[in-house]
Amino acid sequence: MHVLSSVLAVSAFAAMTVPVHALDAWTIGVERGLPTYALTSEAGEVRLVCDPDRVFGPTPNGALVVRFLKDAAPDMVVVLAKSGEQTRLPVKNGISAQATADAADWAKMVATFRTGGEFALVTSADSLTFETAPLPDLACE
């Protein structure tokens, strides 16, 4: 009969009780020739549509599409990174268009997604929180 040492038994028990937190995974795709990145939770979803090559002309066609369970028609969304960085983007019908957003705010939002980690999208009535791996190749400016 093999007897485990008390240290080994305690270590094994501790390893079993440590919760494993899975990162939220971006779903990456292409729509109408534009790269897309989507995150979904029970509380809503966010989809980023990028236009790094100006597929449809010189005007950027990027968009941040948001859906909140408790706030169907926000007019502003704030992207908050755990590091303290934040950016405000105007929203109309659930969409913040890159062409009409402030370029510096759009760049901060992209940097937050590119860096990964924990971040939240917040409206006056609802919020979505995600924790993702970095997206170092995200080209969405």
PLM region descriptions:
Residues T17-P19:
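N-terminal signal peptide c-region/cleavage motif recognized by signal peptidases
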Residues A81-E141:
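Internal interaction segment
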